[in-house]
A protein has these predicted regions:
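Short, small-residue alpha-helix embedded
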Residues: 107, 163-194
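Short, charged, surface-exposed loops that flank catalytic or proteolytic processing sites
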Residues: 110-120, 181-189, 207-209
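Charged C-terminal helix
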Residues: 197-225
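Short pre-catalytic strand/loop immediately N-terminal to key active-site residues, enriched for Gly-Thr
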Residues: 153-165
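A short structural micro-motif
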Residues: 115, 194-197
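Glycine-rich phosphate/dinucleotide-binding loop and adjoining beta-alpha-beta core of small-molecule
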Residues: 1-156
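Feature representing long, continuous alpha-helical segments
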Residues: 122, 152, 171-172, 185, ...
Length: 225
């Protein structure tokens, strides 16, 4: 199975939204055509948090989300976009899953991080019921919620995963599982478990501080092999 990318030439800080980089009018269909799952995130610096990239990033993400006709995993700048365009979730035609950490979910809900962490299951369940999506709320015990009220809590994971880039791997694993036919609830569950177990194994070999997110894909491959 091959992963295809729709790169944007604005990861460089010196490029800005006014530089005339248009979103191809067929971008959503180009990304979705012939594919079984989409992942909306970013690689490297969160371009949606930069003034010069925000407008273009928002245009790209909105077009992809509204045009998606395959299950979609929304992470990083996809979540940043939804913080000010939350109703797009209700208008999506395909199933969607969000993978926020508590601070990102705080931006989406207006609830404080402490309140979210005190009521993780309730918050996740209420969000998915309101917006009709799936949610993976990251944390020491990741909570996975479905819009029909089902909730699962992972039993794998460790502090080795609390690093930038770890969540990108998780979103990719979930997307890969969904592309192979898992429904999003199961893809989130299996993906979170594999991600957490891989982190545990790496922490044993390299220590929690020495383990790197870039080592996770290979370790997940070992677990599956």
């Amino acid at each position: 199975m091959q992963a295809d990318f729709l790169p944007l030439p604005l990861w460089n800080r010196q490029l800005c939204a006014g530089s005339g980089v248009p979103l191809p009018c067929n971008a959503p269909s180009a990304v979705c055509s012939g594919h079984r799952c989409g992942v909306v995130q970013r690689r490297g610096e969160a371009v949606g948090q930069l003034d010069e990239g925000m407008a273009v990033a928002a245009e790209v993400i909105e077009a992809l989300l509204r045009g998606a006709d395959v299950p979609t995993v929304i992470d990083a700048d996809g979540i940043n976009f939804l913080a000010s365009h939350i109703d797009v979730l209700k208008e999506m035609q395909a199933p969607a899953a969000l993978t926020p950490h508590p601070m990102e979910l705080s931006r989406l809900t207006g609830c404080g991080v402490e309140e979210i962490n005190r009521n993780r299951v309730h918050t996740a369940r209420a969000f998915t019921a309101e917006y009709g999506c799936y949610l993976l709320l990251k944390g020491s015990r990741t909570v996975i919620a479905a819009p029909d009220g089902r909730v699962r809590i992972t039993v794998s994971g460790c502090s080795a995963l609390a690093k930038g880039g770890s969540g990108d791997v998780l979103a990719g694993v979930v997307g890969a599982l969904a592309a192979q036919g898992y429904d999003l609830f199961d893809a989130l569950t299996v993906g979170a478990f594999l991600h957490g177990r891989a982190g545990e194994q790496l922490a044993v070999r390299f220590g929690a501080h020495g383990a790197l997110p870039s080592q996770l894909p290979e370790e997940i491959g070992r677990l599956l092999g």
